[in-house]
A protein has these predicted regions:
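Intrinsic disorder/low-complexity detector
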Residues: 1, 72, 84-113
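Short, surface-exposed ligand-recognition loops at beta-strand->loop->(often short) alpha-helix junctions
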Residues: 9-20
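Residues that cap or initiate secondary-structure elements
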Residues: 12-14, 58-60, 99
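Intrinsically disordered, low-complexity segments enriched in polar/charged residues with Gly/Pro
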Residues: 14-15, 40-43, 80
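An amphipathic, aromatic/His-enriched active-site/gating alpha helix that lines ligand/cofactor pockets
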Residues: 20-37, 56-95
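Short acidic, gly/pro-rich beta-turn/loop elements at beta-sheet edges
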Residues: 16-18, 62-64, 103-105
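Short, well-ordered beta-strand segments in beta-rich or mixed alpha/beta enzyme
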Residues: 2-9, 38-70, 93-94, 107-110
Length: 113
């Protein structure tokens, strides 16, 4: 299992557009074959750094996933939205694997008070 960390540099004046873009992947990414961990918008510190994180079995599975995403209707619409609105200034992907090889588990969070 590998995890893809997408680092975005976004226009800080178009955070709302980035959030719309991020929410649109909630269905498309899993439908096309990756395990979405989440999208993260700036909160404190830099107003321009955002992240997307998902896991997938291998680089070969990643290539097949990208091909499915390219023909997915919602995926195509979301890519077009990003190109039209130009809120992503830069995007880079890094692929990592867990050091011990174990799958990443999401921690249980305490209930809000």
């Amino acid at each position: 299992m590998i995890t893809c960390f997408i680092r975005y540099q976004i226009d800080p004046h178009k955070r709302v557009e980035f959030e719309r873009y991020a929410r649109a992947w909630n269905d498309a990414i899993p439908r096309c074959g990756a395990d979405l961990i989440g999208y993260f918008a700036p909160h404190e510190g830099s107003a321009t750094l955002a992240y997307g994180v998902y896991s997938i079995e291998s680089l070969a599975a990643y290539e097949a996933y990208r091909a499915r995403l390219a023909v997915d209707e919602q995926g195509r619409e979301n890519y077009a939205f990003a190109m039209r609105e130009r809120f992503i200034l830069r995007e880079e992907r890094t692929f990592c694997e867990a050091v011990d090889g174990a799958p990443i588990e999401r921690p249980s969070l305490p209930a809000a008070a």
